[in-house]
Amino acid sequence: MQATDSKNKVVYWGTGRRKSAVAAVRLVPGTGAITVNGRDGETHFNRIPTYIQTIKAPLETLGLENEYDIIVKAEGGGLTGQADAVKLGVARALCQLAPENRPPLKSEGYLTRDPRAKERKKYGLHKARKAPQYSKR
């Protein structure tokens, strides 16, 4: 959704989920800075460049990587899940920014929610599928 913040800047919203991570993403016109939970994106993701590249991928597809600041509130999951949740939120916010952004993002797969999640543990098994050792006698 489009809204305005306290400084009358236009803000675009998007929500992303991956595994057990949820990310509420705001896109604000700026210089390309990433802020996650009030901290610098590099600090939050332990300076691992893969996560930063993942987050910026939808912006790079459209050539907007230095035109919008990304402000994120991320909860749950680990760093990989949060990074992928932010990527989905950024892509959804870019679709609200301009409807013509949708086809290139969809063709790259940035608007698809990854449905893979941890399988539940079953009784009688050690983990979701790991069975106790079988003994014939």
Swiss-Prot record:
Skewed-composition ranges (Basic residues): 118-137
GO cellular component: a single term:
cytosolic small ribosomal subunit
Question: What keywords would UniProt list here?
Answer: Ribonucleoprotein, Ribosomal protein
PROSITE patterns xref list? RIBOSOMAL_S9
The cross-references to InterPro entries, in alphabetical order and at most eight, read: Ribosomal_Su5_D2-typ_SF, Ribosomal_uS9, Ribosomal_uS9_bac/plastid, Ribosomal_uS9_CS, Ribsml_uS5_D2-typ_fold_subgr
Task: Supply the SUPFAM superfamilies for this chain.
Answer: Ribosomal protein S5 domain 2-like
Indicate yes or no for the key word Cell membrane.
Answer: no
GO biological process assignments: translation
Query: Which portions of the sequence form the region Disordered?
Result: 100-137
Can the keyword Ribosomal protein be found in this entry's annotation? yes
A Gene Ontology molecular function term for this protein is: structural constituent of ribosome
* Similarity field: Belongs to the universal ribosomal protein uS9 family.
Write down the HAMAP family for this protein, in alphabetical order: Ribosomal_uS9_B
Name of the molecule in the record: Small ribosomal subunit protein uS9
Which species is the source of this protein? Answer: Microcystis aeruginosa (strain NIES-843 / IAM M-2473)
